[in-house]
């Protein structure tokens, strides 16, 4: 699991955690709020590991018995709340795993720590049951609520927890991590970074995804030659990408990044801001051929296509209209 120094970004949260541990100002309840893949589980796990570390420093030592237990997921004083229903944490889940066990003192450490992933999936009854525990917890208890949307939690829970908001990580840090740690080439790191939009977990997932590479190659092949396609070829292209229907949002985002590259190069002639660097000759050619108005029309059409697909408008019709707009501009 490592330590806080290995975490990319989130320096403000890490500083807060270290200070809280060093100054013995640990709260009884925290909300870690951020997108899926933003690092909530990692930060909560490192926080828990630090609180239980036998050396008592602001970072886990990764050497003591407690740290090794935490790293392997087998520490008796770290309880990760689970739920059988995929989209719901029930009142029974909270009562059985939290309320009914929290008064049992820690087995070996100074704290007993509860980590509740997807806390925004708690029912109102489950939240009310947890609220009673948060209001009057034993001194040794620390509860971490991990959520993508803290607004779905009761105001009374929000007001009784310390809020730690995970913000987007700088693109330069994500790209550096992908190239140094995952050893992926520059051009691929650029695409994954642009696509991840500040989310390290998403960037890593994309970098390791063969399917994403396939979707990217399909999009690139279409964009390189769409201006030369006949209507029948465009219809065939739409039929071909129906296999990616579940990932069509990703497919459209790739096209959007491509045309932002075209617009950026047309306006500045600068290559360092281009994402699809491995396709620069095609980016240059399309920047030369297309007008500013045409590129803007394509970007607007992409947004319309996304909205229409969300509204369940016929897939083939939406994509054919989009591709014709791209071809004409």
Which residues are covered by each model-predicted region?
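Charged, glycine-rich active-site and insertion segments that engage polyanionic ligands
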Residues: 1-49, 69, 139-140, 149-254, ...
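Clamp-loader machinery-focused feature within the broader ASCE/P-loop NTPase space
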Residues: 2-125
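Solvent-exposed, charged interface segments at domain starts and junctions
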Residues: 2-3, 118-133, 191-193, 258-259
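Hydrophobic residues in beta-strands of the RecA-like P-loop NTPase core, especially within AAA+ ATPase
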Residues: 32, 116, 130-131, 147
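Conserved catalytic/switch belt of AAA+ P-loop NTPases
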Residues: 128-145
């Amino acid at each position: 699991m490592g330590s806080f120094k290995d975490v990319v970004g989130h320096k403000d949260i890490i500083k807060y955690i270290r200070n809280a541990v060093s100054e013995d100002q640990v709260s009884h309840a925290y909300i870690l709020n951020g997108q899926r893949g933003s690092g909530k589980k990692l930060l909560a796990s490192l926080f828990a590991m630090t609180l239980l570390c036998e050396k008592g420093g602001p970072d886990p030592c990764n050497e003591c018995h407690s740290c090794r237990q935490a790293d392997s997921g087998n520490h008796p004083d770290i309880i990760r709340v689970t739920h059988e229903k995929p989209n719901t944490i029930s009142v029974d889940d909270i009562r059985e795993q939290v309320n009914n066990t929290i008064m049992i003192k820690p087995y070996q450490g100074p704290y007993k720590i509860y980590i509740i992933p997807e806390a925004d999936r708690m029912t109102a009854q489950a939240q009310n049951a947890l609220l009673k525990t948060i209001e009057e917890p034993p001194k040794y208890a620390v509860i971490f609520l991990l959520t993508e949307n803290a607004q779905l939690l009761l105001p009374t829970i929000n007001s009784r927890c310390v809020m730690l908001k995970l913000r987007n990580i700088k693109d330069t840090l994500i790209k550096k991590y992908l190239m140094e740690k995952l050893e992926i080439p520059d051009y691929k790191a650029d695409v994954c970074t642009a696509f991840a939009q500040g989310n390290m977990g998403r960037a890593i997932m994309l970098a390791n995804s063969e399917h994403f590479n396939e979707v990217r190659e399909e999009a690139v092949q279409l964009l390189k030659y769409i201006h030369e396609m006949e209507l029948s070829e465009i219809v065939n292209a739409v039929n071909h990408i129906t296999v990616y229907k579940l990932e069509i949002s990703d497919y459209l985002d790739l096209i959007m990044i491509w045309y932002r590259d075209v617009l950026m190069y047309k306006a500045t002639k600068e290559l360092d801001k281009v994402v699809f660097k491995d396709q620069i000759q095609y980016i240059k050619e399309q920047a030369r051929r297309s007008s500013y108005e045409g590129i803007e029309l394509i970007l607007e059409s992409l947004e319309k296509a996304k909205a229409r697909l969300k509204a369940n408008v016929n897939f083939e019709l939406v994509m054919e209209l989009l591709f014709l707009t791209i071809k004409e501009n």
